[in-house]
C-alpha cells in the first residue's frame, strides 16, 4: 500500500529535520528497489543532497529523473533549472527550459525563467527546510494518486503539502483543480486567488 513509499519519504525528511543527511539518504533506499518508485527516489535524493550542499550529486540524481522521453514535468524543470542557475550552469538551464518549451509549446511558464537567465539573477533555493521537502513529497504523492485512484486521497495529500508549505503554487493549482472537478467552485476560486501574484502561475 501507500506505506511502501510514504514511510521512506517522510522518514527521510524527518531525519533531514534532525540534521542527519546521511541517515535521510539511507532511509530513501527502499524506494530504489521498486522500479515504480525510482523517479521518486531520484528526486528526493537530489533534494536532500542539494540541501546538504552536494550540488554535483544532486544534479546527477535530477538528471536521472528526466532521461526518459515525456519525463519532463514542470516541477522537475523548476528544481533542476534552479540548481543549474545557482551553480553557474546557465547554458544547461537554458537548454532545459527550451526542451520543456519544445515538449509543451502552449505553456507560457518558461518565459519568466528565461527572462531571469538573461538578467543573470539567480532564483531562490526552492526547498530550504525539512518541512518544505516533506511538502514536495506530499505534492508528488497527491499528483501520482490523482492519476491512478481517487480524488479524495489526492486532495488529502495536496492539503498536507499546503499545510507544510502554504506558498506552493503548483500544489495550490493541483488542489484547486481537484476542488473545481468536485464542483466546489468557491473553495477552488479562493485557492486560485491565494497564489502569489509574483509567481508565473
Predicted regions and their residues:
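Amphipathic alpha-helices of TPR/Sel1-like and other helical repeat/solenoid scaffolds
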Residues: 153-163, 192
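Short, structured interface segments
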Residues: 107-122
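Generic helix N-cap/helix-start motif at coil->alpha-helix transitions
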Residues: 2-10, 34-44, 69-78, 90-92, ...
Amino acid at each position: 500500500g501507500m506505506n511502501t513509499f510514504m514511510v521512506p519519504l517522510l522518514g527521510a525528511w524527518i531525519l533531514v529535520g534532525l540534521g542527519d543527511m546521511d541517515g535521510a539518504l539511507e532511509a530513501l533506499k527502499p524506494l530504489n528497489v521498486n522500479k515504480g518508485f525510482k523517479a521518486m527516489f531520484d528526486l528526493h535524493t537530489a533534494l536532500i543532497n542539494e540541501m546538504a550542499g552536494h550540488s554535483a550529486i544532486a544534479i546527477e540524481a535530477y538528471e536521472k529523473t528526466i532521461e526518459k522521453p515525456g519525463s519532463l514535468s514542470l516541477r522537475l524543470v523548476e528544481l533542476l533549472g534552479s540548481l543549474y542557475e545557482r551553480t553557474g550552469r546557465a547554458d544547461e538551464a537554458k537548454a532545459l527550459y527550451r526542451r520543456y518549451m519544445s515538449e509543451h509549446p502552449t505553456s507560457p511558464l518558461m518565459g519568466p525563467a528565461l527572462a531571469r537567465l538573461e538578467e543573470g539573477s539567480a532564483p531562490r533555493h526552492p526547498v530550504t527546510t525539512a518541512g518544505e521537502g516533506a511538502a514536495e513529497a506530499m505534492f508528488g504523492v497527491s499528483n501520482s494518486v490523482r492519476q491512478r485512484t481517487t480524488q479524495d486521497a489526492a486532495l488529502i495529500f495536496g492539503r498536507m503539502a499546503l499545510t507544510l508549505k502554504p506558498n506552493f503554487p503548483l500544489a495550490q493549482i493541483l488542489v484547486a483543480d481537484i476542488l473545481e472537478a468536485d464542483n466546489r467552485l468557491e473553495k477552488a476560486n479562493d485557492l486560485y486567488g491565494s497564489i502569489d501574484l509574483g509567481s508565473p502561475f
